[in-house]
């Protein structure tokens, strides 16, 4: 495939390995195991086990680095076509233009040639050194220097300064600056100051100061420039090397100096070490042509003051350039400076991991125009190689490469004192796969190098982004490398096996010859990137892989590899060397010698260091070191022999390991010497290895001498120690083989075998098959000894030994054979033989006893016990055990079935049958089993009968159950269901006794007692006739209570029936009443005992109930009086809002009532919102027709308001209550509610009698007569157009005239004085009556009667007591009208009631219309919908949260249940019989009530019968 092709074909995948946990525990062992397969590919990938996930240990916040800049299109088209000269020679510029996609024609090739020659070609000439060929070079500018190796190792490593910690000597000193020569400040040195060398012009060579002005002969400089500080160093051979001390480039130096505020008089210089050289005579002649003519064309170098004709330079310059100019030699010298990074330039910005990741992800997302995680790896790979080959697109990326882990921290946990590690981190910190640990493992060669070689022993970190790449290279010293990707996107690798390394180098040289001509070791500089397809097209085998997070990639010795990153990631890499690497390491040194490349460490020193301590070496490593050492000694002998043949006999010992690396390097091949080197007395600054003895110097051989580390006699001694160490395994293996095979006929003792195993462990022999056999033999022998000791101790333990640990007779014999076959002697064999003899004797005795059956059970049992003490299972012992078990089973059956024995359970019987199946068969056993089975069958049948009786829905009478129990008594088995049936029958008898006792008592039974008996009777599995009677009584009692509840309780009432019937116990506490009203949970109501203050036992005594009720009446009255005083002291909501008081009224809604719309309760004197409570209706009284009935007076309007806290029930009429009492008399059950109802009735009748008595007084009768006369006079007078006014009589009621036709309709809607109006019964147009009432209010005057205080006070007290009664009485209404007539009309309340009624009617009509529309829509759709909910038609107060708002509907239901008994009516109007009686006198009307047809005396005997012991004065 051509390099310029757009399609990239991925190479085949490299091998991928997934080790098991057992394999993964030995890293280098596993790598050695896969090496035969993976080495053929050069690289491989290893996926650790899924559970191996090391934590990321880098301190992210403190991790800062500066990446390198990479440009992807470094190999360009011209280089690919063979270079500038080749293209010009073959006239291929048109081909170049075609490859650059320019259109043919138009002389594009010529234009490209001119641009290339002007811009790029000078750089290529500089790179190749062609512009220095004709230069009259100084002695150091020779050909050898041009090809001298540029120190870089991997160049990126060289650009990073070594660690501040223990650096390995050679590398650390190589990168450290030379020892600083003496520096002098010219200003401070008077001798130097006299020289006056500040201006332009030639300077003395010895001072090393150069003139800055390159246009020396032109005087057009605009101002003085500060000359750069330069250093002239004299080399050992008299050479002079000019170096700039500034690390910046020339342009940067110029820019910095031109802006520097420092004066141009301060210089730093280095004094020469040797002043014996001849003085340099400066002349203004061209260094190329050695002529001085045409001085206007002479160009002065700003670095070395050499002169050049601009036309002599290659390529020539058209004119003298402006600014700083350096000659080719100075440019070459500057570029050869070791401290400068070769390869990719360093970026200027410092990144953190977060900022670099944001930059990397942003770049990739912008470049690919899609999310970074969605870009396919194949697409990135193709795009990368397209960009590498492209010259049109200049894509620049940054790569955080070669970051020193010692300074920035490793990605793996490291065991150091900086921070405490968790147990999980500690595990990974010591793992062999931790890249900080792997290079220094015991099997690794690098662990024998003390110094931390950066990049080899100390890992480096790599932070990559998309397209950031690493070029084709092999590792230093051809070592292994391992790379772990901690996290991030994949890293793509390409690898070439070591067998094809030279082939790859040849292809590279063939494709880019110019680069390799100038730099033979180009592939060692990590700056060469070539398309894998190009290599494959030339026959180089290439493999690839994508390394994902958590995976390892291993490169093998001399395996070329390269790759790039798919995106933002973080990797870590390190080198390691194993025993198999040693031959490759030696070959690498020879290869470095040919390339004159520096070594990272001395291979000879490493071998000798390992050979000096052979006992510390791994056995395989010792064998490999011995082999390498032998080759090295042979070569050393040959080289030293060549020295003798040359006549060099002088020698001295030298500890080369103590010398810095740069002081023991061969000046020819740059190899680091260790075993020996050749030096010269006259040239002390240089030495050579023994392979280049002819390249040291020109001095005589007599002046040269050998510097050696070891003598030729010491090297064989070291070699011998290695051999002993390497062959020690063979000696040991021979001993082990003889011991295991018993070749000499003598079994070794256990101690001898343990000594051999201990020797292998101490000398770290490899885990071979022979060692495993020895360990297995020892393990087996120790197990046999332990088992034999256990056998002996088991006999001593006797019957207390664990049964599961016994061995069989066959196992005992096999165990003895095993001990005899082991290759070691054990004295426990005799003990085992003795036990075997005892067991065989016992076996013979047991056989004899079994042959003479039936034997006595005692004899069999004794034999069995003796066998157990032996500790060995004998087959005959099992037969003895079965015979003993048979005898025991028969005895147990006999005891169980004996008549005198305790009855056994069914489980016991079944257990005996199951156990009998496992005993030895015999006729006696069969007979016993048959008897057991028959008995068990009968018992189960009766048990099933009892179970059916207990579980059946149809309960059986007690007589039936008694018969079943009697028949089951004859079975000698304990039957649980029969026993349960007995217990149920006993409970039934006890229950019947309790029923008889409670029914025959002095009093009727209480409902709670009956309910308890019913609940118990229902749970009994016995048919009870009495239960049905009790259930009927309880049902009747519940029905009566439900009927009473409907009569008294409002819908959703928060009170219980008993609470309503009893006096209000908390009438004096406003807060308690109010909180009770707000309570919605019925489960929190007070119990009966709390209401009456009696115990459960006292509630069964009717006398106690009556006494408690009487006490409750008194407490209720006292409480309400206290509450009235408290509430009267509260400010009125109708008063001024500025009135401030700590005690304010609170409505049932929880808010403070204020302003118009507030009503005051006539009983408790508290204030409420009119919209939150049920209010009276003004026109609640029935009306005559306009022609027959007079108008009502204002005192007859219904303005009386009782709050829901005082009016707790519906307050039925006395007639309804008497009907309930009649039904109660027929109940044979006592209820707390019934007795409370009797007390309430007696209290109401008592109050009614007192009220009638008060109304019958003469003064009261006279007042009532006046009201009757006034009513008659109003009836007889004609109706005027305007309502008349009178000072002492009530105003006429225009509503009675104008809307008399509507009164029957209104009367039908008003029940019990309640204000609830049903929208079905009110026409939408009604409302004129309310308007008439509103217009009449300003003309109302009063009072119409004058009530003396002596008359008013008793009536008000009676009114108070009557309002406390939860019963409606006509006398209450009469007293109310009389009191109202004696007071002025309450206009504020009347207005409030009118406004509330108007608002209510308006809301009812709106809801009625909406409901009618909904009903019509449903009918139109054809659906048969139910009638809308009643709550939707009721007014706002009905739908409120207060239960009283919905009592109207329940009152209608109450009428139907009580036979048409309606709510209480007010005092009859004129024209009725009662009115006629009142006109003639009130006495007849007060003498009888509408409900007096049922005298109370007929009801009281029930209550009196309940308490015959009470004295007459306490009875009602």
From Swiss-Prot:
Basic and acidic residues: compositionally biased ranges: 142-151, 232-242, 1294-1304, 1420-1437
Keyword presence, Endoplasmic reticulum: no
Co-factor requirement: Fe(2+)
Region span, Disordered: 142-186, 216-262, 1274-1305, 1400-1516
Binding residues annotated for Fe cation, in chain numbering: 473, 475, 561
Residue numbers carrying Phosphoserine: 246, 260, 276, 852, 856, 1318
Ubl conjugation as UniProt keyword: yes
GO cellular component: chromatin; nucleus
Zinc finger (C5HC2): 666-718
GO MF annotation: an example: histone H3K4me/H3K4me2/H3K4me3 demethylase activity
The entry's keywords: Chromatin regulator, Dioxygenase, Iron, Isopeptide bond, Metal-binding, Nucleus, Oxidoreductase, Phosphoprotein, Repeat, Transcription, Transcription regulation, Ubl conjugation, Zinc, Zinc-finger
Residue spans of biased composition, Acidic residues class: 1444-1459
Subcellular location: Nucleus
EC code: 1.14.11.67
Biased segments, Polar residues type: 156-166, 1471-1481, 1489-1500
Pfam families according to UniProt: ARID (PF01388), JmjC (PF02373), JmjN (PF02375), KDM5_C-hel (PF21323), PHD (PF00628), PLU-1 (PF08429), zf-C5HC2 (PF02928)
Catalytic activity: N(6),N(6),N(6)-trimethyl-L-lysyl(4)-[histone H3] + 3 2-oxoglutarate + 3 O2 = L-lysyl(4)-[histone H3] + 3 formaldehyde + 3 succinate + 3 CO2
Crosslinked residue numbers (Glycyl lysine isopeptide (Lys-Gly) (interchain with G-Cter in SUMO2)): 164, 188, 203, 233, 254, 1086
Cofactor note: Binds 1 Fe(2+) ion per subunit.
Top-rank lineage group of the source organism: Eukaryota
Annotated positions binding 2-oxoglutarate: 399, 481, 483, 491
Record-stated family: Belongs to the JARID1 histone demethylase family.
Record note on quaternary structure: Part of two distinct complexes, one containing E2F6, and the other containing REST. Interacts with ZMYND8.
Name of the featured protein: Lysine-specific demethylase 5C
Source organism of the structure: Sus scrofa
